[in-house]
Regions:
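Short boundary segments that mark the start of a structured unit
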Residues: 1-187
Length: 187
């Protein structure tokens, strides 16, 4: 927050509008300050609140815009206080969260599943290829996960299904492979 007061007593009310240059990064309250001949020397506070936008967009600068004073007192009318520069510190990091696998694949159709979701909202679609290191032992569905700016925080399920290969080969290991994320979002 910041505080504001007048330097001298006005002979009429003085109103100063308060706005944010980018309400997607920060908001202000109240939207105006009103000084009278009785409260002119009392500081009034403006609360600045950063917006948590879920985007890994780095620290973002914006401005608290203080409008020109409006008053019938000619000493104050149209005086324009200095705007205030503010930075919204970003707390979002691009990446994804993968759950532990649940279940065991078998040659009789046994399945194992895990989920994956993004850690921050992308600015463009994010595609992740999913495959098996040995398709003769296990298949993977789906083969591609698509995360958008609207479904990024919703978990998507990947299912591994064992393949009956009719060979007496005991337990066989294979790996579910997650490809590198593909997106025009630079994060």
């Amino acid at each position: 927050f910041f505080s504001f007061k007048l330097n001298s007593q006005p002979n009429a009310n003085v109103t100063i509008a308060v706005n944010s240059s980018d309400t997607t990064e920060g908001t202000v309250s109240p939207s105006s300050l009103v000084f009278t001949s009785s409260n002119w020397s009392t500081t009034q506070s403006v609360i600045i609140t950063g917006v948590d936008d879920s985007l890994d967009d780095g620290n973002q600068s914006y401005t608290v815009l203080l409008g020109a004073a409006s008053s019938s007192d000619s000493n104050y009318n149209s005086l324009d206080p200095t705007d205030i520069s503010v930075t919204n510190i970003d707390d979002d990091t691009a990446g994804f969260t993968v759950s532990s696998i649940s279940g065991v694949t078998t040659e009789y159709g046994g399945t194992a599943t895990f989920t994956i979701k993004l850690n921050s909202q992308p600015t463009a679609d994010v595609l992740i290829a999913v495959s098996s290191s040995d398709t003769s032992e296990g298949t993977i569905s789906p083969s591609t996960l698509t995360f958008t700016s609207t479904n990024w925080s919703t978990t998507q399920t990947v299912t591994a299904t064992g393949v009956n290969d009719s060979a007496v080969d005991g337990n066989q290991s294979y790996t579910v492979l997650l490809g590198a994320a593909s997106s025009s979002d630079s994060n």
